[in-house]
Amino acid sequence: PQPMKAQLDKTAHYYDLKTHPGQVVVLKMQVKNLTQTTKTVRMIPEPARTNPLGDVVYDRTVGQAINPRLGFEKLATGTQKMKLSAGQTRYLTVKVRLPKTMGNGVIAGGLHFQEVTAQRQRSQQQMLANRYAYVLGVVLHTGYVKKVAKVNLQARTMGHQIGIGINNKANQFVNQVKVTQTVKDARGHVVHQAAVQGKQLAPNVTAAMTLDQHTYQPGDYQVTTRFTSKTVHQTVTNNVKVK
């Protein structure tokens, strides 16, 4: 992506822009062919979605669209195709037209770049199956952008596993998320530790997840969960019973 003054997170490798209702957001990017042969590339705008774990994903077969009423694919320039000779760099412009009546909120999507091959041109099904070769994320904020300072956390049992329920009530993404859990038995001995990191939590989402596939014997456990991100740092301790 080309740098923009409206970029909120200067360290992000995707568009994270402050916008306003009615604005036409112009996204400029360069596409380079690093191979020694001519390539044809197709760009397709798609909405961002939330999977059952609360993660932001760009696969239209998974989960629910983020802000479906204002679908990113409806607002952005349609599919574009370009041919690049070996080593060639070309510039691509995508316009996103924000409704004047949209109010405050977040619109999220992805620009999907894929190589077009003769096989994909012959088979639409094959093209769809391989459409997510590379995704450039786009997050557009209108109104006051409030940093997420807290999420709701609650350890819970899922059969013979121990996981965590997460609720992000804010209309903002939570980036660079790391979740760790330390589980102690009734005698206070640490019986298991687990962690996941690199998650991006969607806005207005409630999700439940386990950090790994570890199973527990029936009994009482104390679970300490630590949730950290760019703006959130919190720890909660809960008692749970595995039956």
Region locations from a protein language model:
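Short acidic, flexible loop segments centered on an aromatic residue
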Residues: K39-P52, V57-Q64, Q114, N171-R187
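Asparagine-centered strand-capping/turn motif at beta-strand->loop junctions
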Residues: V31-T37, I166-A170
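Short, solvent-exposed loop/turn segments enriched in Ser/Thr/Gly
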Residues: G22-K28, R90-L92, N104-G110, H160-Q161
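C-terminal, structured domain-capping segment
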Residues: L92-G143
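Membrane-proximal extracellular "stem/stalk" segments
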Residues: G143-K243
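Intrinsically disordered, low-complexity Pro/Gly/Ser/Thr-rich segments with frequent PxxP/GP/PP motifs
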Residues: V62-M102, D185-P218
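N-terminal edge beta-strand
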Residues: P1-V24, R156-M158
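A short tyrosine-centered beta-strand micro-motif
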Residues: K39, I107, L111, G219-R226
